[in-house]
Regions:
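Short beta-strand-loop-alpha-helix junction that forms the active-site gateway
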Residues: 152, 321-324, 622-634
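Conserved catalytic cores of phosphodiester-cleaving nucleases, focusing on short active-site segments
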Residues: 612-627, 640
Length: 704
């Protein structure tokens, strides 16, 4: 273990003296080292660290074991709640229930002397109230260390508030949970991660102030301005150069505001690299967490949110231009201030940082908040500028005019349930609990692998492929036709003649008949690759033997014993993968427009697309291959049912079946309840959160 720096030792000394400490720490400043050194220097204190990030928890736990530290335990909010309150607390919904019911601990809480609240800039009211409950249930006063970086608060739209860090002393003032009422403010300004050149870029170009200090020299920050097509080629070429020089794929991040979108630059770069047998990983959804096994040994394409708390040697930031505000941060009122997401993205690299600015249209321009222009970059010693510099830029008048026209929002159940604000979840959770009942409890669990190892030694997540292949095999045995093959064929129709030749070749070589689960898993992978326009799983999964014949027999028997009951008689109705609404069909949205109009601006319209897993004469089924039925699954079914009612369709039962566990959840509802939930979800996504004033915040968030 390295000796603590002066900044870090000051934090530890204040803790030794019995004070509470609030510490603002820049990216890469050694918060984890400070935590470990505190544990080492205070062996007589029992310490609990609560952190936001499960991957960080795992990393620190490994270091605790390595250094033989026995007086510290590491938890996330969820793991702590699971340990002492309920197995259901692995989700926010479970924690919310514990607070609502004031659930008593299921075992005695071990006494602690010092509680370290890490990454507290991303604390929300839910987590804050859980910490208070936990400490009260423990029953003895403690000392606290509150750590974080207000500029790394990324989840404000979900209810996170950096004031839990910046106003911590006022929040906790007078609390009987504390041994001492004395608070000391410290800071960790020295970043041991980024280079001097990156530090200068952050300080001088992004913030115009001495935000952070650095202590190692490196190469200049590479700033590239070019067309989208040329940037794609440049990134691929540069990554190949790095790999040829000995850099490993696992040492490269490619970050963007979003990795979604069929024509996104991120996907084109990934496909170009995978075509050259370079291992890559792209999350299926922008909100997916990065699994350590799955990303191991690969170039990772990710959002800024998913990369938080991580670092790699080389980082490419795609879309480092004003399109960020136009496309991904429309609700930010002040474009003259650096968003936290871009600060996080620019502080993930340890060796090389590449910033990519698009120069495709006359209105493309640099980020408004930058304190330096292209010509300033050329003159500086910490930036290598590539491209044609400009100093005069056109205003996007067409975009300004468009603001007064009809603003259509294209939604699907999957998109609607991502990044739901805590305030919305607090409102809808009691309603959802009333709507759903367990009509069939968990029975024998079928062991279906969710992550598999390939011949190349990589790991791939296959839960999405299982969820497509197993129901498809069941449908085909009912209908005696290959539904999945038809879905693949229909998806290919949308592709242009000269694109995705690799996928077209794969489809051409596929057998029309599927005889085993292996065939269905391969076909599911092909279908997913076509839908997402991503090649990596198709290229990197080399065997499809992770589900045995016995397992698939068990799955089919379970499906037949549950769904087959509704398919008795002659010519039973069974419509798998059934489209109930499409965003392009205006007449389907007439009633929806009427119902939503009172809740949203006059020029805002919503257009929905939704596909249900299985429609029978009696029910609409959502089929899952997962560990448990979650809040997200229930919300999807709520949205399906609401759309179904808006279309004035005949009444049906809405059910969720977990194929792995056999659990069935049924929804009983009134249409007004569904509308309340859908409106709340849409408002949470498209309306700005009204932040409380500091006085209101302190009034409501007090530890007293």
């Amino acid at each position: 273990m390295n000796q603590p720096s002066e900044e870090q030792q000051l934090v530890i000394d204040n803790l030794k003296n019995g004070y509470n400490v609030v510490c603002s720490a820049v990216a890469g400043s050694g918060k984890s080292s400070t935590v470990l050194s505190t544990s080492k220097q205070m062996p007589d204190r029992q310490i609990l660290q609560i952190t936001y990030n499960s991957s960080l928890r795992l990393e620190i736990k490994e270091k605790v074991k390595y250094f033989g530290l026995e007086n510290i335990s590491i938890h996330t909010f969820h793991s702590l709640a699971v340990k002492y309150y309920s197995p259901d607390c692995h989700t926010d919904t479970g924690i919310r229930r514990v607070l609502l019911n004031d659930t008593k601990p299921r075992s005695e809480i071990l006494k602690i002397d010092l509680c370290m609240l890490d990454e507290f800039q991303d604390c929300s009211e839910l987590y804050f109230r859980f910490v208070l409950k936990f400490l009260r249930d423990m029953g003895s006063p403690i000392q606290i260390l509150i750590l974080g970086d207000p500029l790394q608060c990324l989840y404000g739209f979900k209810g996170a508030d950096s004031r839990f860090l910046t106003m911590a002393d006022q929040i906790w003032k007078g609390s009987d949970l504390l041994k001492s009422q004395t608070f000391v403010h410290c800071s960790l300004k020295m970043s041991y991660r980024i280079t001097d050149q990156m530090g200068k870029f952050v300080n001088e170009a992004m913030f115009g102030s001495q935000l952070m200090l650095t202590c190692k020299s490196g190469e200049p920050v590479t700033y590239i301005r070019n067309s989208r097509h040329n940037i794609e080629k440049t990134v691929v070429y540069t990554i190949k150069e790095l790999l040829d020089s000995g850099v490993k794929p696992s040492e490269i991040f490619v970050l963007a505001a979003s990795v979604k979108g069929l024509n996104s630059n991120v996907r084109k770069m990934e496909n170009a690299l995978v075509d050259q047998n370079i291992p890559c990983h792209v999350p299926m959804f922008d909100t997916d967490k990065l699994d350590e096994r799955v990303i191991g040994g690969k170039i990772v394409f990710s959002t800024f949110h998913c990369a938080k708390g991580r670092q790699r040697k080389y980082v490419f930031v795609i879309g480092f231009d004003n399109n960020y505000f136009n496309q991904f941060a429309r609700t930010l009122d002040d474009t003259s201030q650096c968003p936290n997401t871009l600060y996080v993205g620019c502080t993930r690299a340890t060796h090389g940082l590449y910033l990519l600015e698009f120069d495709q249209y006359p209105t493309d321009r640099p980020l408004d908040f930058l304190k330096m222009g292209h010509h300033d970059f050329i003159k500086s010693d910490f930036v290598k500028f590539k491209g044609i510099p400009r100093s005069i830029f056109y205003q996007d008048e067409a975009g300004d005019k468009a603001k007064s026209l009809i603003d259509k929002k294209y939604e699907s159940p999957t998109k609607m349930i991502k990044f739901i604000p805590d305030s919305v979840l607090d409102y809808i959770s009691p309603i959802i609990d009333r709507l759903f009942t367990i009509s069939s409890p968990i029975s024998n669990t079928i062991d279906i692998p969710m992550i598999v190892e390939t011949k190349g030694g990589f790991f791939e997540s296959v839960s999405d492929l299982n969820g497509i292949a197993i129901p498809s095999l069941y449908y085909d045995r009912l209908n005696r036709e290959n539904l999945l093959y038809k879905m693949v064929e229909n998806s290919m129709i949308e592709m242009k003649e000269n694109e995705h030749m690799y996928l077209k070749r794969i489809v051409k070589e596929m057998p029309v008949q599927c005889e085993s689960i292996k065939d269905y898993l391969l076909l599911a992978n092909v279908y997913t690759a076509i839908q997402e326009r991503l090649y990596f799983k198709l290229k990197q999964i080399d065997e499809y033997d992770w589900i045995s014949e016995q397992v698939i027999t068990d799955c089919l028997e379970r499906l037949d014993s549950i769904i087959g009951i509704e398919l008795k008689g002659e010519n039973p109705q069974v419509l798998p993968e059934h489209v109930i609404i499409h965003h392009s069909i205006e007449e389907q949205h007439a009633k929806i427009d009427q119902v939503l109009a009172p809740h949203f601006p006059d020029n805002m319209r919503f257009r929905f697309s939704a596909v249900v897993d299985l429609l029978t004469e009696a029910s609409i089924w959502e089929l899952k291959c997962t560990g448990d039925i979650s809040m997200d699954h229930k919300l999807q079914v709520i949205i399906y049912a609401w759309i179904w009612d808006m279309l004035d369709k005949p009444a049906k039962n809405f059910k969720i079946l977990n194929i792995i566990t056999g659990e069935i959840v049924t929804m009983n509802y009134e249409p007004e309840e569904l509308t309340r939930i859908v409106v709340a979800l849409l408002k949470g996504k498209y309306e700005n959160i009204n932040l409380k004033t500091d006085d209101e915040f302190l009034r409501d968030m007090t530890a007293v």
